[in-house]
């Protein structure tokens, strides 16, 4: 299929050429606050379509990249590569907790690296340097070296890609089908007395950048590779509005039962404390005084009403006390 027919199936995007990163929160913000001319709808359609194409190209049983999955896993993010206003590639990243075999100790260790969960460049744009542009943008934005990234079930083409551009070759086959290159273990040593990797085993990396300060990768220039410089796109995205202040509750109002109002047990305990204090002032030892019989909570509530007894008229018009049931005169 030609490049024109492939692109025709994708909606036009109002994004600059280059790489942008999206997570579930950023997509939700676009849908709510920045959906001019169906921009957010087209963006989500592009991510879903490229996710389906990635599934078909890799002969997978399920779609790995979709807007729904990004909403379910807020830690995952997708790097989207655009060219001439259309999405041409995606790279999905996320942190995973893995138990892998250490290449030197031949024992299982626990790590939680940033993982490549899905990587796809549209077939019409392959072998033109777009894949390296996308991968380099991810490494620069995350602050990682190529060997510090784990890959979920990489294809033969992906492994050849990593060997060609980053010299990643040596890895130990794992039962979970994740590929963790030996370079990942160069910086870390297991802690004594523990059968797993230390708590700080994950490489230092930057957090997900919010969409309002997203760095956009520069426009693709040639097949010689990117220049590894991000440029701030301050005019394309407006910052999200500040969070709304909490609602004001007027004094004396009760928002829900029990808020700003003491329970019967609290009233009973306060009455007990007042009685003990009174006995101390009288000079007696409260521990030697007889303990009064406990009072039920309903009696405390009834006593606290005092003169404000709840009244209810009968059919005959005679008022009675709804607590005692006696007529009122």
UniProtKB/Swiss-Prot annotation:
Statement: the UniProt record of this protein carries the keyword Transferase: yes
Domain of life: Eukaryota
Annotated site residue numbers, Crucial for catalytic activity: 58
GO terms of molecular function: DNA-binding transcription factor activity; sequence-specific DNA binding; tubulin N-acetyltransferase activity
InterPro entries attached to this UniProt entry: Atat, GNAT_ATAT, WRKY_dom
Taxonomic classification: Eukaryota, Discoba, Euglenozoa, Kinetoplastea, Metakinetoplastina
Record-annotated N-acetyltransferase domain positions: 5-185
GO cellular component entries: microtubule
EC numbers for this chain: 2.3.1.108
Keyword Transcription: no
Protein's recorded name: Alpha-tubulin N-acetyltransferase 1
Keywords recorded for this protein, A-Z: Acyltransferase, Transferase
Region (Disordered): 218-261, 306-329
Membrane-traversing stretches: none
Catalysed conversion reaction: L-lysyl-[alpha-tubulin] + acetyl-CoA = N(6)-acetyl-L-lysyl-[alpha-tubulin] + CoA + H(+)
GO BP terms in the entry: regulation of microtubule cytoskeleton organization
Positions annotated to bind acetyl-CoA: 119-132, 155-164
Family: Belongs to the acetyltransferase ATAT1 family.
UniProt feature, compositional bias: Pro residues: 238-249
Comp. bias (Polar residues): 220-229, 313-329
Primary role: Specifically acetylates 'Lys-40' in alpha-tubulin on the lumenal side of microtubules. Promotes microtubule destabilization and accelerates microtubule dynamics; this activity may be independent of acetylation activity. Acetylates alpha-tubulin with a slow enzymatic rate, due to a catalytic site that is not optimized for acetyl transfer. Enters the microtubule through each end and diffuses quickly throughout the lumen of microtubules.
UniProt-listed Gene3D superfamilies: 3.40.630.30
């Amino acid at each position: 299929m030609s490049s024109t027919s492939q692109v025709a199936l994708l909606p036009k995007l109002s994004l600059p050429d280059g790489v942008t990163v999206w997570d579930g929160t950023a997509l939700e913000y676009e849908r709510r606050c920045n959906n001019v001319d169906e921009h957010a709808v087209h963006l989500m359609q592009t991510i879903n379509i490229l996710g389906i194409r990635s599934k078909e190209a890799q002969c997978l049983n399920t779609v790995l990249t979709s807007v729904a999955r990004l909403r379910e896993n807020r830690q995952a993010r997708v790097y989207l590569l655009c060219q001439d206003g259309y999405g041409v590639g995606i790279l999905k990243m996320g942190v995973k907790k893995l138990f892998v075999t250490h290449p030197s100790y031949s024992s299982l260790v626990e790590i939680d690296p940033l993982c490549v969960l899905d990587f796809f460049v549209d077939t019409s744009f392959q072998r033109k340097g777009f894949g390296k542009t996308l991968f380099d943008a991810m490494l620069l934005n995350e602050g990682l070296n190529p060997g510090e990234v784990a890959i979920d079930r990489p294809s033969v083409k992906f492994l050849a890609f990593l060997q060609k551009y980053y010299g990643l070759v040596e890895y130990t086959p794992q039962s979970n089908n994740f590929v963790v290159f030996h370079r990942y273990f160069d910086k870390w040593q297991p802690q004594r007395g523990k059968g797993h990797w230390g708590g700080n085993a994950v490489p230092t990396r930057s957090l997900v950048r919010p969409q309002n300060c997203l760095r956009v990768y520069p426009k693709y220039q040639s097949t010689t590779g990117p220049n590894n410089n991000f440029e701030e796109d301050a005019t394309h995205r407006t910052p999200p509005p500040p969070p709304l202040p909490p609602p004001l509750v007027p004094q004396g109002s009760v928002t829900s039962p029990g808020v700003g109002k003491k329970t019967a047990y609290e009233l009973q305990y306060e009455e007990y404390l007042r009685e003990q204090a009174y006995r101390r002032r009288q000079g007696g030892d409260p521990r030697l005084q007889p303990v009064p019989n406990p009072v039920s909570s309903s009696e405390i509530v009834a006593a606290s009403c005092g003169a404000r007894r709840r009244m209810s008229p009968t059919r005959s018009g005679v008022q009675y006390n709804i607590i005692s049931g006696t007529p009122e005169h």
